[in-house]
Amino acid sequence: MPDPAATRAGAARARATALARAGERLDRLSLYPRPVRRERVRIVVAPFAFRLPWLRRFDGYAAWGLILLRSAAEDDDLLTHELCHVWQLQHRPLRMPLSYLRSGYDGNPYEAEARAVVAATRRPAVAATAVATATATATATATSA
């Protein structure tokens, strides 16, 4: 029978490695004045949280220094997307979450920026203009608020 402590330690190492990979993807970009600070970011696999009606449609959720994931399956794109939200929150701790009240999820410029970041860092062929466009939209929306 496997040792539960060793299993937990292995899972924690895997999450830390995945977080480092996501951070390296974000480090290639200069969307914000400072790079994402990931030292205190915790990843918690919490499938029960995604039974809540307002989280049901998501596979991940970021709140400041916490990233909740529906499953333990490694998905670098999802983790990069959520870590991008942590980065956004580090630079716009009030404006970013309040933007969901104004524009909802589907039309939210911070969501567009996180999706563009994933696309731009996944494939080198994707033009950097996708990130620049999403950032310009997020900035224009945030400054008009």
List each model region and its residues:
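A metal-dependent hydrolase signature that marks the N-terminal structural subdomain at the beginning
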Residues: 1-46
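Short linear elements at protein peripheries
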Residues: 5-6, 24, 80, 116-127
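Compositionally biased, intrinsically disordered low-complexity segments enriched
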Residues: 8, 13, 17, 129-144
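Short, flexible, glycine/charge-rich loop motifs used to bind or transfer phosphoryl groups or to couple energy/partner
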Residues: 31-34, 50-51, 57-58, 68
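Pocket-edge structural micro-motifs
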Residues: 45-47, 70-72
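Post-HEXXH active-site segment of zinc metalloproteases
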Residues: 52-56, 62-63, 73, 77, ...
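Polar-ligand-bearing catalytic/cofactor-coordination segments
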Residues: 63-71, 80-83
